[in-house]
Amino acid sequence: MKASMLAKLDQLAERLDEVNALLAREDATANIDQYRKLSREHAELSPVAEQYSQYRQAQDDLATAQALLDDPEMKDFAADEIAAARDRLEALQASLQRLLLPKDPNDDRNLLLEIRAGTGGEESALFAADLLRMYTRYAERQRWQVEVMSESESDLGGYKEVIIRIAGDAAFSRLKFESGGHRVQRVPATEAQGRIHTSACTVAVMPEADEVGEVEINPADLRIDTFRASGAGGQHVNKTDSAVRLTHLPTGIVVECQDDRSQHRNKDKAMKVLAARIKDMQTRAAQAREASTRRNLIGSGDRSDRIRTYNFPQGRVTDHRINLTLYKIDMIMDGDMDELLSALSAEHQADQLAALGEDA
């Protein structure tokens, strides 16, 4: 293992000792926020320290076995012990490398998922509805909560745009690689002659701000408009000005919410979406600066990146970032996304490990 990595592990082991001492103090719970922060840090450091302790023990075992090689009676035993210790060291080194990978601070957050119809007109809007169902079904399989924050329906029951909030354990970490362009190839319901059409939607996955105050929004930078809600096809909606449109003047971000009959609740939803979009914009700007020196194999998550194709006649889903094709389109569209999402996470981890090797 490289000296830089060993030094990092020594620092983490020392920090765990410090955290243990702080948590053992009589007044540890006097500041509950600080106590929670220390508890989370303890939970993150403990597995690393435990693995590092095992690694050092394996090093000691190797040194002891090598010292026995000069004893003719112990030579065979020592050779077996050396082989076993080297195997343990190799496995522990790989495990420690994974534990040392930089953690995305947003991984444990809830998220906002936005789907927009793109090229393809009404068929694109219908595909947006299919994607919404796919993500909703996946969330249900994880026992996550799903809430519609904003929706704009098309005439045939699709969506020009829809935003949902997904709340659950490590939700963002599982779905964060879904941002980008999703292309569909199929015979549309509106096609009379059976020709295959290509349409597209864009998906944006944004970590939810822990609270709106986490993202600084100056009230003077907001323009708030209220108007009467309206639905597709002349559906009945309430007759008061309950719909809310927020315009963030510095960034030009516009958010509309009209799904609730309460103007106050619509404004609360709109503020959550606005905070997430501003945070997402800030995160992408930081990632763009980082990407100038290193390109992530999974891609930037930019909406202009075509990341996946859903080919219904062939029954396949292809993720272009990792060259993965799965012939189980019906299962995936029904929310069975684990194989796909796990492959993306594994590729991302491999990319991080390669970067760690370059930096070490």
From Swiss-Prot:
The modification N5-methylglutamine is found at Q235. Transmembrane segments: none annotated. One of its GO terms (molecular function) is translation release factor activity, codon specific. It comes from the Bacteria. Methylated by PrmC. Methylation increases the termination efficiency of RF1. The keyword Cytoplasm applies. The keyword rRNA processing does not apply. PROSITE patterns: RF_PROK_I. It holds the Pfam family PCRF. It is found in: Cytoplasm. Keywords: Cytoplasm, Methylation, Protein biosynthesis. GO terms for cellular component: cytoplasm. PANTHER family: LD18447P. Peptide chain release factor 1 directs the termination of translation in response to the peptide chain termination codons UAG and UAA. Belongs to the prokaryotic/mitochondrial release factor family. This is Peptide chain release factor 1. It comes from Cupriavidus taiwanensis (strain DSM 17343 / BCRC 17206 / CCUG 44338 / CIP 107171 / LMG 19424 / R1). The gene is prfA.
